[in-house]
A protein has these predicted regions:
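Structured-RNA-binding interfaces characteristic of tRNA pseudouridine synthases
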Residues: 1-253
């Protein structure tokens, strides 16, 4: 039995998230189906990040076990023949049989895009959050600085989170302007349920003048969800990539 790692990109618009759900299309379901059609094996992929409905990815990670003799790097092209256009395998290789995509030391990078125009653009409706009016980028940057570092992010996650600990480390948090788009780029060792979207909603409210930048410090200390900003909608969020710090995902030669 061999373990194959996949780098998966997808447009999450049409899917009810990553994880298999009854009577709803998901990324995991499509990958399982493609592998079954290619190899004849009834296998199930394990994903590194179980993204929500409407969330996208450039570089999510998944693994599956197979008895197929197809070379690891050939699964990229072989599986793409069985996948819809909205899901593409970017790379594939064989890894150690004990590699688990969620049980390793990782750094994940997410991007959230906000379209700041008077009227929305239909071409961007599935990939941005449309926010009208003036937004102070510099105030957003000030607030973002308080979020970097190791903190208890209980105020910045869904109250239904099942995580054993709400402490996470944020390595960087950038607020960038690209024309009419504001980009929030965040890198951390892990993220709680809805954490990036709540951080985004909070920063936007800072930019709109509803919160002062320094109030973010009080949000972190309070550990109460209702003190932070709104949860930004899912479609602006993209998982950019996942770095395995200890090289656990090394290629098997």
């Amino acid at each position: 039995m061999r373990r194959i790692k996949l780098i998966v990109a997808y447009d999450g618009t049409e899917y009810s998230g990553w994880q298999i759900q009854p009577e709803a299309p998901t990324i995991e379901m499509c990958l399982d189906k493609a592998i079954r059609e290619l190899t004849g094996e009834n296998v199930h992929v394990t994903g590194a990040s179980r993204t929500d409905a409407g969330v996208h990815a450039y570089g999510n990670v998944a693994v599956f076990d197979t008895e197929s003799t197809i070379p690891g790097d050939r699964f990229t092209f072989a599986l793409n023949r069985f996948l819809p256009d909205s899901i593409v395998i970017q790379d594939s290789w064989e890894v150690s049989s004990d590699f688990h995509p969620r049980h390793c030391n990782t750094r994940k990078t997410y991007e959230y895009r906000i379209l700041n125009t008077a009227v929305p653009l239909p071409q961007k409706r599935n990939f941005t959050w449309h926010v009208t009016g003036s937004i102070d980028i510099e105030k957003m940057k000030e607030a973002a600085a308080y979020i970097v570092g190791e903190h208890d992010f209980k105020s910045f996650c869904c109250v239904r989170t099942q995580a054993e600990s709400t402490v996470r480390t944020i390595y960087s948090l950038e607020v960038l302007q690209e024309g009419s788009e504001i980009i929030i780029r965040i890198k951390g060792n892990g993220f709680l349920y809805n954490m990036v979207r709540i951080i985004t909603g909070t920063l936007i409210q800072v930019g709109k003048g509803r919160f002062k930048p320094e109030y973010v410090k009080q949000m972190l200390v309070s550990k109460v969800r209702t003190v932070a900003g709104q949860t930004a909608p899912p479609q602006g969020l993209t998982l950019v990539g996942i770095e395995y710090v200890d090289n656990d995902d090394a290629r098997v030669v």
